[in-house]
Amino acid sequence: FYARRMNKLGIRLGIYIPINVFDIGLKIDHYGSIVVNGMCRIGKNCRLHGNNCIGNKGEGRIDEFPMIGDNFDLGTGAVVIGGITLSNNIKVGANAVVTRSCLEEGAGLVGIQNKNLRKGNTK
């Protein structure tokens, strides 16, 4: 019953988030087009801004999923894919595509190449 009810609500809102992926404190700022793979693990106090995807890369790699720490902030249109690990307090900018791990706490990742703004990369 629960799964059917959540599936109907998810279809209506455009959100697909399986059970037990996020820890407590998930906040979704805007509804619509949020897809999270059920094998991902995401820590406490995650914030999604809409039009996001968190999952595997496809290409037959069904066993590689992101592991994300606490206080994660994913900007509008941003994507996190592949078997990567992201540390705590990371912010991902709008429309960024994160495909590489970042173990530095408090990093700010932007763009396709995952430039870390907290390290002084401003280009």
Where do the protein language model's features map onto the residues?
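Domain-scale signature associated with acetyltransferase and cell-envelope carbohydrate enzymes
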Residues: 1-54, 69-70, 78, 88, ...
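Glycine-rich hexapeptide-repeat left-handed beta-helix
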Residues: 50-52, 56-123
